[in-house]
């Protein structure tokens, strides 16, 4: 747990399933709690698997001291004027990018490639992604009703991705794959695990599976270690808040790990404490419980 009496602590907070519910809805208490923690002198960094270009503008508008993106491949420090200073960057070696793409193509697996500036989709992924986003729109409306809001108060943004042909393969840091085969994740872990970090994805696909692939050793936890070293802060005074399997290394790198109420029970078991759900003031309740608000 975090050491008592520290004048300043740092919070690393996931986006999807932690700040955002189903891609676009933010509990008002989350916004006020993060801003209150920063006003109290604590640092708050986003720590997300998304590329920087894919972070919802409403999330950015909350205000943060820095961003770890692409699952730990990139990190920036933010200033009060909105300027960014890049503090870490770990590109996937080109030979690994080629190996990963060949694996997908040979196996008939649909995928997205991530760079710092965007997301690129393989041909044929459109229909599967469109169905996922249709389901997300339905859940978005349900989330708004749960908060007493109308649909037009927080419209769902258009999900934008570019064709694979436009990707600079020398700038790739991560991929997300989608398959109708429920065994594809296990196979990818077995076939690629010698050089890649392969973890379950978060896209709900009945009858299929999906995952995220990054360079072995590049993850949220490794990025947090770099940021803490840069800032001269001890891990004991760091807090990590998340909900999915790409948060495991974050939990291991911080002094206090907080799992969201909707997280997988196995992930909750790895946390120091479990807060409530995203729309049930989960982030706010965690920061209050830790004395940061």
Question: PLM ranges: what are they?
Answer:
Residues 1-15, 32, 39:
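Non-catalytic pre-domain segments flanking phosphatase-related domains
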Residues 2-10, 27, 210-293:
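Mg2+-dependent phosphoryl-transfer enzymes with acidic/Ser/Thr/Gly-rich catalytic loops
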Residues 24-40, 90-97, 155-161, 218-229, ...:
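Short, acidic loop-to-helix structural element flanking the phosphoryl-transfer center
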Residues 25-139:
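Active-site phosphate-binding/coordination module
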Residues 40-45, 64-65, 173-174, 236-237, ...:
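Short active-site oxyanion
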Residues 62-63, 71, 192-194, 253-254, ...:
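Short, structured coil segments at secondary-structure junctions
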Residues 64-72, 197-200, 257-261, 276-277:
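Short hydrophobic/aromatic-enriched beta-strand-loop microsegments
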Residues 114-239:
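Conserved acidic, metal-coordinating active-site core of Asp-based
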């Amino acid at each position: 747990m975090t050491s008592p009496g520290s004048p300043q602590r740092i919070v690393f907070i996931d986006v999807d399933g932690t700040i955002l519910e189903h891609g676009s809805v933010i509990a008002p208490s989350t916004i006020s709690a993060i801003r209150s923690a920063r006003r109290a002198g604590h640092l708050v960094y986003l720590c997300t698997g998304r590329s920087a270009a894919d972070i919802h503008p409403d999330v950015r508008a909350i205000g943060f001291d820095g961003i770890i993106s692409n699952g730990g491949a990139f990190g920036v420090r933010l200033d009060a004027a909105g300027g960014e200073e890049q503090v870490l960057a770990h590109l996937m070696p080109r030979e690994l990018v080629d190996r990963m793409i060949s694996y997908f193509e040979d196996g008939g697996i649909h995928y997205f490639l991530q760079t710092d500036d965007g997301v690129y989709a393989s041909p044929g992924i459109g229909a599967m992604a469109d169905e996922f986003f249709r389901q997300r729109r339905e859940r978005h409306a349900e989330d708004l009703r749960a908060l007493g809001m109308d649909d037009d108060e927080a419209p769902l943004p258009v999900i934008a991705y570019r064709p694979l042909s436009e990707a600079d393969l020398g700038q790739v840091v991560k991929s997300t794959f989608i398959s109708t085969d429920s065994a594809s994740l296990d196979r990818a872990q077995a076939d690629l695990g010698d050089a890649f970090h392969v973890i379950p994805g978060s896209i709900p696909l009945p009858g299929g599976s999906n995952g995220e692939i990054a360079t072995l050793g590049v993850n949220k936890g490794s990025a947090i270690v770099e940021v803490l070293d840069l800032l001269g802060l001890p891990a004991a005074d760091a807090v990590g808040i998340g909900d999915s399997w790409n948060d495991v290394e974050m939990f291991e790198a911080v002094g206090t790990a907080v799992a969201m109420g909707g997280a997988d029970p196995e992930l909750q078991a790895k946390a120091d404490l479990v807060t409530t759900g995203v729309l049930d003031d989960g982030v706010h309740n965690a920061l209050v419980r830790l004395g940061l608000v």
